[in-house]
Regions:
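Long, highly charged low-complexity segments enriched in Glu/Asp and Lys/Arg with interspersed Ser/Thr
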Residues: 58, 171-234, 253
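OB-fold ssDNA-binding interfaces and closely related basic DNA-contact patches used
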Residues: 1-130, 170-171
């Protein structure tokens, strides 16, 4: 990565990065401006449910954690825009250096992912209540719920709602998957507004895709994005009993 590349990296149009916390059945996002009792800044903020949004674009990446006795290993990757984008998976243990552990198309590396590293789908969404672009990450239980919902519904023709679903159990693990629902259909004015808003996302993702086409510099991959800190508390790792396999070809892109 050279001088121009460093100073001209694409900037995400998303203003808020949210994710589902299955262990508690909550949707949260990181707010760096929240002042904590100890005077420090930054905390997870819980979203009010049901949460309404419009889906504009989808991408995918690998992320997750592998807790250890003394340190935790974090897994993360670049953002893959197209199905054939090369995904570079990194690991970082404690304060140690980041290391590349896998690289290739998802179909070629999915069986080689270490325990704790999981596929995540990032939804670029428009939130009417805040009138802005945001990013919603679906992983684990929330990804499974989203895939099933998207198979049965026209997700690009209506606003979507997200709320706490019924408690589910896998082995000894109890968690709350989200429940997605269909809200009102887009009228002509809304369609025009969303099409205009989507242009900035498409432009950003084109830059990301172009970067993936040339090469993925490990220095360009976020190592500690605040919005993902603490995600190991989302829900316990579900036991690998063969029932959690996600058919990647069923993810709607």
């Amino acid at each position: 990565m050279g001088f121009n590349d460093f100073h001209n990296k694409p900037t995400s149009p998303a203003k808020v990065f949210s994710r589902w916390r299955g262990g508690e059945g909550k949707l949260t996002h990181w707010d760096g401006q929240v002042q904590n009792p100890d005077g420090s800044l930054g905390s997870e903020v819980e979203e009010k449910l049901p949460f309404k949004f419009a889906i504009l674009e989808q991408t995918r990446r690998i992320s997750g954690f592998a807790p250890g006795k003394t340190t935790t290993t974090r897994f993360y990757s670049n953002e893959a825009v197209e199905f054939d984008d090369v995904i570079t998976v990194m690991s970082k243990t404690g304060d140690g250096p980041a290391q590349k552990i896998l690289e290739g198309k998802y179909a070629d590396i999915k069986e080689k992912l270490p325990q704790g590293a999981k596929l995540a789908v990032q939804l670029y969404i428009y939130v009417p209540e805040r009138d802005q672009i945001e990013c919603l990450t679906c992983q684990g239980a929330s990804l499974g719920a989203f895939i099933e919902f998207s198979k049965k519904n026209r997700i690009y023709e209506n606003f979507i709602t997200m709320e706490k679903g019924e408690e589910a159990t896998t082995g000894a693990v109890h968690y709350f998957p989200p429940k997605f629902g269909i809200a009102e259909a887009y009228d002509k004015d809304t369609l025009g507004k969303l099409a205009e808003i989507d242009k900035s996302i498409v432009s950003y993702l084109k830059s990301v895709h172009d970067s993936n086409e040339t090469s993925v510099d490990i220095n360009e991959i976020d190592q500690t994005p605040k919005q993902y800190d603490g995600e190991q508390s989302q829900e316990q790792v579900q036991p690998d009993d063969g029932t959690q396999e996600i058919n990647f070809n069923e993810i709607p892109f």
